Regions:
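Hydrophobic single-pass membrane-targeting/anchoring helices
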Residues: 1-39, 190-193, 468
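A small/polar active-site loop signature that marks catalytic segments
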Residues: 223, 232-380
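Active-site SXXK
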Residues: 99, 113-131, 227, 252-257, ...
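Short, well-structured active-site flanking segments
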Residues: 128-144, 261-270, 378-381
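Mid-domain, small-residue-enriched loop/turn segments at the edges of structured enzyme/sensor domains
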Residues: 88, 146-175, 182-225, 232, ...
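Beta-lactamase-like hydrolase cores
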Residues: 41-110, 178-191
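Small-residue-rich helix-loop
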Residues: 104, 315-468
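C-terminal region of N-terminal signal peptides and the immediate post-cleavage residues
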Residues: 20-60, 134
């Protein structure tokens, strides 16, 4: 399917979600009428969508009077797809409007969630920090003469250059922060300054003991600190991730200060428990909003950013900025929002830990909460769900005959570990009914790649049928 067609379908689904927030009496008229289908392009046969693909001329807006899919019909279609000798498959499909269970395949059985766990982290961050909150990185005058304190506020998407207001990664720049600092100092620091780093907002171990050392070595994650550039990713392709991203960012900041005429004397030091006497702020830059960072985290499945946001959410509840506090606050948050947490185990906040245990039913409840809940902060997580065949971690998927019906329509968070594949999200079916779903594959003997087409086909089946 052409990218433009996928984009149009994705746009229709976005409008459909927006319509959910509009009272039915106001939305009495159809939300819109889709343009007529364009002439069929000449494309390779292998890329042609299947005959079951919903026609582009069908209005893709949720219809309050659209019939729910018949559970028996849905089971007849999904069970053959979600049956495999290679591994264990579980799943659940809910009607978004009513919460009715339309499909259940051992949905309450706990399974390893992989990066689908980031949906829990997203909800905790949005609820406890606020969608429009920005994270500040500041420079203060230290308690000792000639000393500056670089205070970390949790922004790990800092850029090395000037602040880029239109970006999420690099929204706040260290060069802009340094320029403000030099201007505030005037000519009083020509002889140099000493730079101290205050990253005391986080506590506890920087590396979670539940993470596989192979994942750390491979760069799937790095030690977690509340300050970093580019989410602690290397500047050069093939480079290694910093083992202390906060110190690396502070050293970069010191280098920039030197280039601007304020040399930093000696090595960058650390303020172990903050510097309470450092109260005069000289300069500050602010990150993209929490909602924008959550969307970036979900779209790119950014493990480091997920861990940081979860710890910040804990501090938002006056808890320590530790990994243990982060998972505890996430669990308490989703429970308070009505998610059944029976059997739910959170060992980290990114989904890398094999000790995590979440059921498909719990993911379906969480997605329903995001899509139809009345909390405006939490609803902002919708922007982070990748669109099948179009964006994020789903960009290169849904291009086969079995899955093309979901291209541009399925919006879901992906999850991948060596023997784990998961997919949780939402889709508008052919009759205009909004469905939420979670499909989970664990213990696949041939690896996670064996499970991926099964999960994608299951989600595409929801998009392509009315199932009545």
């Amino acid at each position: 399917m052409r990218r433009t067609a996928r984009a149009l379908q994705a746009g229709l689904l976005a409008l459909a979600l927006a319509a959910l927030a509009v009272p039915a009496a106001i939305n009495a008229a159809p939300a819109f009428i889709a343009p007529p289908s364009p002439p069929a392009p000449v494309i390779p046969a292998a890329q042609l969508p299947p005959a079951s693909l919903a026609p582009m001329g069908v209005a893709a807006s949720p219809k309050a009077d659209a019939a729910q899919p018949d559970p028996a019909r849905l089971a007849a279609l999904l069970n053959p797809i979600l049956t495999s000798d290679a591994g264990s498959l579980t799943g659940q499909v809910l009607d978004a409007a009513t919460g009715a269970v339309l499909y259940d395949r051992r949905a309450t059985a706990a399974a390893v969630p992989a990066s689908n766990l980031k949906l829990f982290t997203a909800v905790s961050a949005l609820k406890n920090l606020g969608a429009d909150t920005r994270l500040q990185t500041s420079v203060l005058r230290g308690s000792e003469p000639g000393t500056l304190v670089l205070r970390a506020g949790g922004d790990v998407l800092l850029g090395a250059g000037d602040s880029a207001p239109g970006a999420v990664n690099g929204h706040a720049g260290l060069t802009s922060l340094a320029q403000q600092t030099v201007a505030a100092l005037g000519g009083s620091a020509g002889g140099g300054v000493r730079l101290l780093l205050d990253d005391s907002v986080f506590t506890g171990a920087a590396l979670n003991p539940e993470w596989d050392t192979g994942d750390v070595t491979a760069g799937e994650i790095a030690p977690v600190f509340p300050l970093a550039t580019n989410s602690a990713m290397p500047d050069l392709k093939g480079g290694s991730r910093p083992q202390d991203s906060a110190l690396a960012a502070a050293q970069l900041f010191a280098s920039i200060l030197g280039k601007l005429g304020v040399p930093v004397q000696g090595a960058v030091g650390r303020v172990a428990a903050g510097d309470p006497a450092a109260t005069e702020q000289l300069a500050a830059v602010a990150s993209a909003t929490v909602a924008e960072q959550v969307a970036y985290m979900l779209q790119n499945s950014d493990n480091f950013l997920a861990e940081v946001l979860a710890r910040l959410a804990a501090t938002g509840q006056q808890r320590p900025g530790s990994s243990a506090a982060a998972t505890a606050v996430t669990l308490a948050t989703v429970k308070s929002l009505g998610v059944d947490v029976t059997g739910l185990t959170l060992a980290d906040s990114s989904g890398l830990a094999m000790a995590n245990q979440v059921s498909a039913a719990q993911f379906a409840q969480l997605v329903k909460l995001i899509v139809t809940g009345d909390d405006a902060n939490i609803r902002r997580a919708i922007d982070g769900f990748p669109v099948a065949g179009l964006s994020g971690t789903l960009e290169s998927r849904y291009d086969t005959a079995e899955t093309a019906a979901g291209s541009g329509l399925v919006r879901a968070k992906t999850g991948t570990l060596n023997v784990v594949k998961t997919l949780s999200g939402f889709v508008l079916d052919a009759d205009g009914r909004l469905l939420v779903f979670s499909f989970m594959g664990n213990n696949f003997s041939g690896g996670s790649a064996v499970a991926q087409p099964l999960l994608d086909q299951a989600a595409a089946t929801l998009a392509g049928c009315g199932c009545r």
